[in-house]
Curated annotation (Swiss-Prot):
Gene Ontology terms: biological process: negative regulation of DNA-templated transcription
Record-linked PROSITE patterns: ZF_C3H1
Presence of the UniProt keyword Lyase in the record: no
Official protein name in the record: Zinc finger CCCH domain-containing protein 65
Basic residues: bias regions: 307-320
Gene designation per UniProt: EMB1789
Length: 675
């Protein structure tokens, strides 16, 4: 029957099997012996059939395997049925063993009670064997009232005889009589197998009840949700989960039985209805599990969300918060007018490239490991490689020397005039060879001259510097002579001659450069204005000497006046040279002899005082010239007439000597002041 009704509520397990069977026996004993009315379950009926057979064989003893079956089979079959007899014996032995195991747990009292109802059980067995397809209506009503598990057992018992009828039968007519015995044996075997399955099911239930209960939270939640709306029954403890555990055990047993029914593969409508009922139960269970999973997932998600709210912000949240703060700060600064200072990026200074000094000399052994740069041409690249000339250079392009030897002349060809290598020589033979006479001597002379030049070069430089200094002396002398010309213009030519003679003595081998004649300044230079007095007096003396011949008296008077004027000292120091004390020095010179001035002793003869020495020599020559002139005048008769002229000349010479001594004293003091 197909069940369109909701699944049955879970119920508790039956009472122990022994009490249940005893109640059924007492209940069945009250009915008549009509075979059509029976209220016993199919499993109980099968057990009763087995017990009646055992009670008939040995009512007061334990169950023993029946031996009459094997004996009757041997009598019927005879010699030709030995093989089938052996099969029947084995089947009967197995049956006796199984029945013995079952009968061990049955009381003798139950067996005696069963013996009273032998007729009832016989009629029931005939009903099963004769009408396998048809079942009485009373039994059908009873099956519907019973549990589903017992109904399944009955269906299995009804179907298995069909399998048992497929026993192979020999076509021999002698074996037809023996077919009835195996059928009866097989029917008994089917009944015993059904009983065994029922007993095994009960044992499994009892063992599952004894197992520890899994206190998983999901199971408790699911049971509590299914039975959550019900109130607590009387006598039931709140929170007692034993009933729920029993319900779960029943569900496992039902699923196991459904699996067995699916393996049988029968097409009965009752089985299909049972399968649909089991599928609905499974669907309900699956829905309950899904609901439990959703509730558990929600329970798991709820604490997680609360933890996230309470926990610290993540890195992304912190980054977003910082970005918002920066944007807000930038807007505030823009509103206030604050601008960021923009600085030009400073370019890094380029590193100076340091070349390897060993590589420049062509002898770096570090190679690629060298810390300094090799990106340059070594200095040895301008010299030929001697190893390449002999074709033994192993460096190739990395050689620091030049391998293009055609740029360099061949030494053998230039010096000797020939090369023993001939055309195989890598050097150039384009140069003209030297003569044999020139080559050895010329090389020696050239080398000797180079050595001497190198050795005497410092001496030459010193001599050259001295010569240059001497060449500059005439210019200095010309300046001094020009200054002296202001003092003594009459003896200008004599002084020039004397200076030329002295310079010729000093520079005997040196030809002085030609100095252009210096013009006389119209105005005395600054600082030398005191010489203007002497100049005017000297000019007057020159005029007087020119006009002395016609007017001797006037000339004498003029010369005396000039000498007196020249002997007088200036009242004050000249303008511009007030730092010199001429008065004390001039008084000393007047007290001394004019022939031997004291300043001449202090003059130095070193090369630095060439000017002073030249002036001294010029003065000496002038004095000698004047003395010689006087002597000539004394010896000459023409000049002896005019004695007055002689006296005047002597006075003039004396005055000139005094003037020269004064000039020397002035120049010496001036030179000492500079030093």
């Amino acid at each position: 029957m197909e069940s369109s009704v909701a699944p049955f509520p879970h119920r508790r397990t039956h009472l122990p099997n022994r009490n249940y069977r005893s109640l059924l026996y007492h209940f069945c004993s009250s009915f008549d012996r009509e075979p059509q009315i029976s209220l016993a379950t199919p499993a109980v009926l099968q057990e009763l059939v087995l017990r009646t057979e055992i009670a008939q064989e040995s009512p007061g003893e334990t169950c023993e395997p029946p031996e009459n079956l094997s004996i009757t089979e041997s009598k019927l079959n005879g010699v030709s049925g030995d093989s089938s007899g052996e099969k029947v014996e084995t089947i009967s032995q197995e049956k006796s063993l199984m029945l013995g195991d079952i009968c061990d747990g049955i009381d003798l009292q139950d067996a005696s009670v069963v013996s009273r109802h032998t007729d009832f059980f016989d009629s029931f067995e005939l009903m099963i064997n004769e009408t396998q397809d048809s079942v009485p209506e009373s039994c059908v009503n009873l099956f519907e009232a019973l549990d589903v598990n017992d109904y399944d057992i009955v269906q299995n018992v009804l179907e298995k005889p069909n399998i048992a009828t497929q026993v192979q039968v020999d076509p021999v007519e002698s074996e037809k009589k023996a077919e009835e015995v195996p059928k009866s044996v097989e029917s008994n075997e089917v009944i015993s197998s059904g009983v065994l399955e029922a007993c095994n099911g009960t044992v499994q239930r009892e063992m599952e009840l004894e197992k520890p209960v899994d206190n998983s939270p999901v199971l408790v939640d699911s049971v509590s949700r299914i039975v959550g709306g019900d109130d607590v029954e009387e006598g039931e403890i709140s929170g007692d989960d034993n009933d729920d555990m029993l319900v779960e055990d029943d569900e496992t047993v039902e699923r196991h039985e459904e699996y067995q029914v699916s393996q049988d593969g029968t097409g009965n409508s009752h089985l299909t209805s049972h399968k649909s009922f089991g599928v609905e139960v499974m669907n309900v269970d699956n829905q309950a599990k899904k609901i439990d999973q959703t509730f558990s997932n929600e329970a798991k998600m709820d604490p997680g969300t609360s933890i996230k709210k309470r926990s610290a912000p993540s890195k992304d949240a912190k980054a977003r918060k910082r970005a918002k703060a920066r944007i807000k700060r930038a807007q505030e600064r823009i509103a206030l007018g604050v601008k960021k200072l923009k600085l030009k990026p400073v370019a890094p200074k380029p590193k100076p490239i340091k070349y390897c000094r060993h590589y420049l000399k062509g002898r770096c052994h570090e190679g690629d490991k060298c810390k300094f740069s090799h990106d340059t041409i070594p200095e040895t690249k301008c010299s030929p490689c001697c190893y390449f000339a002999t074709q033994s250079c192993m460096k190739g392009d990395d050689c620091p020397f030049d391998h293009d030897l055609s740029k360099y002349p061949c030494n053998n060809f230039i010096t000797k005039g020939f090369c023993y290598r001939g055309d195989s020589c890598l050097f150039s033979h384009k140069g003209t060879p030297q003569s044999a006479s020139d080559t050895p001597s010329a090389n020696v002379t050239v080398s000797s001259t180079k050595i001497t030049a190198a050795s005497f070069s410092p001496q030459k430089t010193k001599k050259q510097s001295v010569r240059d200094a001497i060449a500059k002396l005439p210019a200095i002398q010309a300046r001094v002579s020009s200054s002296v010309a202001f003092l003594k213009p009459s003896s200008h030519s004599n002084q020039r001659n004397s200076s030329d003679a002295s310079s010729s003595k000093i520079n005997e081998h040196v030809t002085p450069p030609q100095v252009p004649p210096l013009r006389k300044p119209s105005v005395a230079p600054k600082g030398m204005s005191f010489l203007s007095l002497d100049k005017t007096s000297q000019e007057d003396t020159v005029k007087a000497s020119s006009a002395s011949k016609p007017n001797t008296d006037n000339s004498d008077s003029q010369t005396l006046k000039q000498s007196q004027q020249g002997s007088f000292l200036p009242l004050g120091p000249p303008k511009g040279i007030s730092f010199l004390s001429f008065a004390s020095e001039e008084q000393k010179t007047l007290n001394r002899e004019p022939q031997k001035p004291a300043s001449s002793k202090n003059l130095k003869t070193t090369p630095s005082s060439h000017i002073q020495s030249s002036l001294l020599s010029a003065m000496k020559l002038a004095a000698e010239f004047e003395s010689a002139k006087v002597e000539r005048g004394n010896n000459d008769p023409t000049e002896a007439v005019n004695k007055s002229n002689v006296t005047v000349d002597t006075a003039v010479t004396r005055n000139s000597g005094n003037i020269s001594s004064k000039i020397l004293e002035f120049l010496s003091s001036f030179s000492h002041g500079k030093n």
